[in-house]
Regions:
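Metal-dependent phosphoester/phosphodiester hydrolase catalytic core
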Residues: 1-7
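Metal-dependent phosphoester-hydrolase catalytic domains
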Residues: 7-21, 28-158
């Protein structure tokens, strides 16, 4: 999967100058696995936003892990944590960027979780456990991406 996504990203980057790419999904790999770190993000033009996050999107036994990920083109990544204040847009303007990643998070709303009687703590509230309907939502927690999208006309007038 990582190789197919890499070829697709390369193709888009050849026909478009600085495209805004968002790749999202359950990769069945951790951000640190070779398929994501080397194959998909190895050129440095794509960034895995989930890398370094503390809590996971799914839980196997007592361990949280991150299989659900957002990978974006580097030109969407903010230069620093103050990049969204008005006076910090000048640097981005030179790069003709108008879409930024403002925030990424794993949604951990209480209704998405249940107590884990076997291993302690909490785990995602599943829809099914085998063939048995549990009434929950998923065995993975959802992830959310907050983007700052600037209209070019509005963007360049500042």
């Amino acid at each position: 999967v990582a190789e197919v996504l890499r070829r697709t990203a390369d193709s888009l980057m050849q026909v478009r100058q600085h495209p805004y790419l968002i790749i999202m999904g359950d990769f069945n790999d951790y951000p640190s696995n070779k398929s994501l770190r080397k194959v998909l993000c190895g050129k440095g033009d794509l960034v895995n936003l989930m890398e370094g996050m503390k809590k996971g999107t799914y839980r196997y036994r007592a361990e949280w892990g991150i299989f659900d990920q957002f990978i974006v083109s580097r030109n969407m990544q903010a230069k620093n944590k103050n990049a969204f204040t008005k006076n910090k847009y000048a640097k981005a303007k030179k790069e003709n960027a108008s879409v930024f990643v403002k925030n990424v998070q794993i949604l951990r709303h209480p209704f998405l979780l249940e107590e884990d009687d076997k291993y302690g703590g909490q785990k995602p509230f599943r829809t099914y456990n085998g063939m048995k309907y549990m009434g929950g939502y998923s065995d993975h927690l959802p992830i959310a991406l907050d983007l700052l999208i600037r209209d070019d006309k509005d963007y360049y007038s500042r």
